[in-house]
């Protein structure tokens, strides 16, 4: 695997603290001006449940089951941010790229790759979710798979959200949703609010339940 530096000027996100949803202290020290959130929900247990949940996450199944239409998809190159250090104000320092090869689900659906850009249209839990987004990172480790997505210019809110599927020591499988958002200029104050995020997170958390067919 080769790492190289880049400015990431093409298809850039509209916020500075790229990757901050992966920080353990996000809830205590969110990027300045942003509202953080974190919720988790148990999906079941076992290897099969973990595999089904992670496959759904990495093929947009989570979003589609939550009521979001995925449009204008431009696959990424597999390049993602890695090894990010943060300043005290949450600004990332010296981002490094890593390259990941394209992978596919059992049914042949391509997995989401870092750098992919999409436009969301629809609603989650009755809350509108629209606008352009970029996949910041995809992490696959034993018992831990995560997807981080950031907003781009033209979105009514600015920030990042990560979705993590975990298989814990007791074999239980969980989804963890973390984010930080604020409304963009001219957007309604409700956008980026704690109530809106809680409503949306609850819908995301339940979208992967076995009863939903995933």
Regions found by a protein language model. Name each.
Residues 151-155, 178-186:
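Short, solvent-exposed aromatic-acidic interface loops
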Residues 5, 9, 181-214:
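A conserved amphipathic terminal alpha-helix motif
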Residues 51-62, 154, 170, 206, ...:
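Short, intrinsically disordered, mixed-charge
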Residues 119-169:
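Hydrophobic-ligand binding "helix-grip"
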Residues 57, 162, 191-195:
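Extended Gly/Ser/Thr-rich low-complexity repeat segments
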Residues 34-36, 111-115, 128, 158, ...:
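A general secondary-structure signal for short beta-strands and their flanking turns/coil
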Residues 1-114:
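Hydrophobic ligand-binding cavity/cleft-lining segments
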């Amino acid at each position: 695997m080769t790492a190289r530096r880049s400015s990431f000027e093409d298809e850039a996100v509209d916020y500075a603290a790229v990757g901050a949803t992966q920080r353990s202290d996000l809830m205590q020290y969110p990027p300045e001006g942003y509202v953080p959130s974190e919720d988790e929900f148990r999906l079941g247990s076992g290897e099969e449940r973990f595999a089904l949940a992670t496959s759904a996450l990495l093929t947009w199944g989570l979003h589609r089951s939550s009521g979001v239409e995925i449009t204008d998809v431009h696959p990424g190159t597999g390049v993602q941010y890695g090894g990010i250090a943060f300043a005290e104000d949450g600004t990332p320092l010296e981002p490094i790229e890593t390259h990941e090869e394209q992978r596919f689900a059992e049914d042949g659906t391509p997995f989401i790759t870092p750098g992919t850009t999409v436009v969301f249209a629809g609603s989650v839990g009755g809350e509108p979710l629209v606008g352009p987004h970029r996949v910041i990172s995809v992490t696959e480790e034993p018992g831990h798979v995560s997807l981080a997505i950031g907003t781009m210019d033209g979105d009514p809110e600015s920030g990042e959200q990560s979705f993590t599927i975990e298989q814990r020591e007791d074999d239980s499988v969980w989804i963890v949703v973390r984010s930080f958002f604020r409304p963009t200029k001219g957007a309604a104050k409700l956008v980026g609010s704690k109530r809106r995020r809680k409503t949306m997170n609850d819908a995301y958390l339940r979208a992967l339940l076995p009863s939903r067919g995933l």
